[in-house]
């Protein structure tokens, strides 16, 4: 009975304290609020915050020794088992801060996000991408550990040198192992990216325009997809609930079929290693005909969150793709927008979904076109854009040439000038 009770009772979250250096470069209060939410997503509870305003970090420990004493006392008093730093630390900084806190475990913001991704990864590709990001994060920290081994082994005499040599040998083995694993993961992911590219080509041949939902994590992208297409995608009120892109067919009011893609959510200062590891997944947005930027209508930081979304998109060569902006969760108190170009929706109540679908129809009407063409037999190569990036719906070999009816993208219209029927 007690074993069953243990299974049914949820393990309480790990208590942590948050540490931050406020250099006046960003809103420290908002950043810590987001860090607290990230902790919650990793089954942690932030029980205290210790911040320090200073222009330059303290050498080796980032915060001043007095602040770290304050943090150590808070951790001991409140029973915190870990300190989470709002930023990225080097291996030596993590070690020095941990020593100053009496041996308390220390992680940084990057490690926290990577751990969340690791726990959320479901598909094989997602797991490999996360492992790659984790290894790239840890590799330079192995080097920091090597410096510590050198200092420890430098006490003098042949014995010290022997200890240092043994330590450095183990470090080199660790480095080689990590480098080899990184290379192996990169090779596997490159093969998966090749297959993803083949899937994109197959998808393009259907002629269905692609619409991607992008935005900050936990703004309701999956809920919006389910509201538009019918329940299928897993929903959860948590950060990074979706790591792998999910595609669903959506019929617009005009009868046009489109492919709606739900993508991984963003967060401010998304770790570079994570962006690199998930680049092939994030690049789904770059193959879209329309991008829907989704924000939480009730979140005061929605404009900042959209700015983060645009920053990531700009790095993925999406500048020329039309974008719609949607404030989802408009049923929440305080949700509003005075901008006529912003669409208000509620995946929960269905409000605004018809308007969103009509707007998609309007935008896509400028992106795809239905054509009837007759190509002379010495010009059959001109059919390639319709076959590869659009769709062929009717194909007839006639006496005077090849007759085609189908869908083409706007950028391919010029290929058929002079051959329209």
Where are these regions (language model features)?
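C-terminal-of-GTPase-core extension/linker across diverse P-loop GTPases
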Residues: 1-17, 140-219, 225-226, 230, ...
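N-terminal accessory targeting/assembly segments
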Residues: 1-114
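Switch I (effector-binding) loop of TRAFAC-class P-loop GTPase G-domains
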Residues: 2-4, 196, 202-209, 227-259, ...
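Conserved C-terminal guanine-recognition region of P-loop GTPase G domains, centered on the G4
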Residues: 5, 30-40, 72-77, 87-104, ...
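Conserved beta-strand segments of the P-loop GTPase G domain that flank and frequently precede/overlap
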Residues: 18-22, 49-52, 84-86, 292-296, ...
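Flexible beta-alpha connector loops of hexameric P-loop NTPases
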Residues: 22-27, 56-61, 120-126, 170, ...
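Conserved nucleotide-binding/hydrolysis micro-motifs of P-loop NTPases
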Residues: 22-26, 54-56, 88-91, 111-114, ...
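Short alpha-helix plus adjacent loop in nuclease-associated cores
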Residues: 111-130
């Amino acid at each position: 009975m007690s074993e069953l009770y243990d299974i049914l009772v949820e393990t309480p979250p790990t208590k942590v304290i948050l540490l931050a250096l406020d250099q006046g470069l960003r809103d420290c209060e908002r950043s810590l609020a987001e860090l607290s939410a990230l902790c919650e997503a990793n089954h942690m509870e932030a029980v205290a915050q210790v911040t320090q305003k200073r222009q330059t970090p303290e050498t080796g420990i980032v915060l001043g020794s007095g602040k770290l004493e304050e943090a150590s006392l808070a951790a001991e008093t409140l029973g915190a088992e870990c300190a989470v730093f709002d930023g990225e630390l080097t291996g030596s900084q993590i070690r020095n801060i941990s020593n100053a806190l009496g041996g308390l475990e220390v992680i940084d913001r990057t490690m926290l996000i990577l751990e969340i991704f690791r726990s959320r990864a479901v598909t094989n590709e997602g797991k490999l991408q996360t492992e790659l990001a984790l290894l790239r994060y840890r590799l330079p920290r192995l080097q920091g550990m090597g410096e510590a081994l050198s200092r420890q082994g430098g006490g003098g005499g042949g014995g010290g040198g022997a200890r240092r040599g043994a330590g450095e040998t183990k470090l080199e083995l660790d480095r080689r192992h990590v480098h080899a694993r990184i290379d192996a993961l990169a090779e596997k992911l490159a093969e998966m990216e090749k297959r993803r590219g083949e899937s994109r080509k197959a998808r393009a041949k259907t002629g269905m325009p692609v619409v991607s939902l992008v935005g900050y994590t936990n703004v309701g992208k999956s809920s919006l997809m389910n509201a538009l297409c019918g329940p299928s995608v897993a929903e959860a009120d948590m950060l990074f609930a979706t790591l792998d892109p999910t595609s669903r067919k959506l019929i617009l009011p005009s009868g046009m079929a489109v492919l709606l893609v739900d993508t991984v959510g963003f967060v401010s200062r998304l770790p570079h290693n994570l962006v690199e590891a998930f680049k092939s997944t994030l690049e789904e947005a770059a193959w879209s005909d329309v991008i829907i930027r989704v924000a939480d209508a009730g979140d005061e930081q929605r404009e900042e969150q959209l700015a983060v979304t645009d920053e990531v998109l700009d790095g993925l060569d999406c500048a020329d793709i039309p974008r719609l902006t949607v404030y989802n969760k408009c049923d929440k108190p305080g949700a509003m927008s005075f901008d006529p170009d912003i669409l208000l929706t509620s995946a929960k109540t269905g409000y605004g979904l018809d308007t969103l679908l009509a707007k998609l129809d309007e935008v896509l009407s400028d992106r795809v076109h239905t054509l009837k063409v007759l190509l002379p037999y010495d010009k059959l190569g001109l059919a390639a854009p319709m076959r590869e990036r659009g769709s062929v719906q009717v194909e007839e070999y006639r006496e005077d040439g090849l007759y085609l009816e189908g869908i083409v993208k706007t950028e391919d219209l010029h290929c058929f000038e002079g051959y329209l029927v």
